[in-house]
């Protein structure tokens, strides 16, 4: 339906996720360490904070999705205005999380919990309309695939703090391997300013197709929608995979802070690791759509997850003290899950389409909110890092190195859990029903279904 997306449209959509990820990656990588090492909060309490935030998300996300779905389109569209409405508050809330006022442990614990939950709520206000925006920009499968790749690229650029922060903020302590809280706060202020500027450009360069907005402008009954979702094997399995893939990414990022700082004693290598981990994505980008047309999304994921599972198993069993062997194996882990990282949002679109196909209703905002909630549950799963690190006896006040027992525990924590999560993803993708053949059938029948609905509304 309608004209093709322009390069400007793709760029506008891409950079919005860059802005989102500028703060998001810092939360996933450094918040646990900030809480334990700067604020002095125990690992168990940090994990509890993350889980409380996710419990609130279980209530907040579906409600937000239904509210967005009910919103009537204005002159600037249905979803685009949220980029500005929520973008600036999101940037400010990210800074507030890393603002330390006193040395009082109780106050700091309550404050960081409150600001983190606030950040999560505003992130939902941003992410649900932003994700839904892709579904009303185009209904063409190849363009949706391109938007998903574009979003992955944008998210990758948003990980720039992971490249620079080890150099900027990991400079404290006698050995220069500890986090500096003041530097982290200043760096977050710079990040927030960049986010605001990017949101302005993104809003200006994106567009919505009125006919697709019309299809999505249906009355929402959240209870019946959730019942439909629970009965939909495609939606359930892909939502779980979406949550697990972000759990793996964030878990590894968070665990690597301890692994590189304590086990390998080379904090700066986290930047090298990040570059190596994104190489598979860079290699795949030009070929993603060709791969989909030839083999299908599910089929590619089955092979990819198998590669990742083997590489992560070797990494765990090998207990490698050579950091380069660990990084090389990480390349293959990321190679295997790279396709789903690139195409996760296109596959989200597929399961929204599947819901429309089987129910006759198109409720992308509510559907997307549920999918986003599962990804937030993935974040919560990744939040067990400080709990596990504390359980193995990690001492943040240790003079010099941790004990060998703790160091071995850090390595196991960093490699065993990702292996188990990847195996679980492999099982789920085998259960996912949308094969290449089934997806093609769905799109053909949906096209007829939509044309009939639009004709009946004229």
Annotate each predicted stretch with a short phrase.
Residues 2-458:
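Membrane-embedded alpha-helical bundles of multi-pass transporters/translocases
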């Amino acid at each position: 339906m309608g004209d093709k997306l322009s390069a400007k449209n793709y760029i506008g959509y891409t950079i919005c996720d860059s802005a989102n990820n500028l703060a998001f990656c810092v939360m996933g990588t450094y918040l646990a360490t900030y809480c334990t090492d700067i604020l002095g909060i125990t690992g168990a309490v940090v994990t509890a904070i993350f889980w409380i935030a996710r419990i609130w998300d279980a209530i907040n996300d579906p409600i937000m999705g239904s509210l967005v779905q009910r919103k009537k389109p204005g002159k600037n569209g249905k979803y685009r205005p949220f980029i500005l409405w929520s973008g600036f508050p999101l940037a400010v809330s990210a800074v507030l999380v890393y603002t330390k006022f006193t040395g009082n442990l109780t106050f700091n614990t309550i404050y960081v919990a409150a600001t983190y939950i606030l950040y999560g709520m505003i992130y939902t206000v941003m992410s649900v309309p932003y994700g839904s925006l892709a579904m009303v920009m185009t209904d063409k499968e190849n363009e949706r695939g391109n938007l998903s790749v574009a979003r992955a690229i944008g998210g990758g650029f948003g990980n720039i703090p992971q490249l620079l922060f080890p150099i900027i903020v990991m400079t404290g302590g006698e050995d220069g391997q500890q986090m500096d809280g003041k530097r982290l706060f200043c760096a977050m202020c710079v990040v927030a300013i960049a986010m605001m500027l990017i949101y302005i450009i993104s809003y200006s360069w994106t567009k919505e197709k009125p006919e697709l907005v019309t299809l999505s402008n249906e009355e929402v009954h959240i209870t019946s929608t959730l019942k439909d979702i629970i009965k939909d094997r495609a939606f359930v399995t892909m939502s779980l995979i979406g949550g697990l893939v972000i759990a793996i990414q964030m878990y590894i990022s968070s665990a690597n802070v301890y692994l590189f700082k304590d086990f390998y004693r080379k904090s700066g290598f986290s930047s090298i690791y990040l570059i190596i981990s994104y190489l598979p994505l860079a290699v795949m980008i030009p070929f993603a759509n060709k791969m989909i047309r030839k083999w299908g999304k599910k089929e590619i994921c089955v092979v990819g997850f198998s590669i990742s599972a083997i590489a992560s198993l070797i990494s765990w069993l090998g207990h490698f003290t050579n950091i380069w062997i660990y990084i090389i194996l990480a390349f293959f882990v990321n190679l295997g899950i790279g396709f789903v990282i690139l195409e996760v949002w296109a596959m989200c679109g597929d399961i929204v389409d599947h819901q429309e196909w089987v129910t006759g209703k198109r409720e992308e905002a509510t559907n997307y909110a549920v999918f986003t909630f599962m990804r937030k549950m993935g974040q919560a799963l990744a939040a067990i890092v400080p709990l596990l690190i504390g359980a193995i006896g990690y001492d943040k006040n240790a003079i010099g190195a941790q004990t060998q027992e703790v160091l071995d525990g850090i390595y196991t924590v960093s490699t065993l859990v990702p292996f188990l999560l990847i195996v679980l993803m492999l099982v789920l993708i085998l259960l996912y029903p949308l094969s290449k053949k089934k997806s093609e059938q769905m799109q053909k029948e949906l096209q007829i279904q939509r044309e009939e609905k639009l004709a009946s509304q004229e």
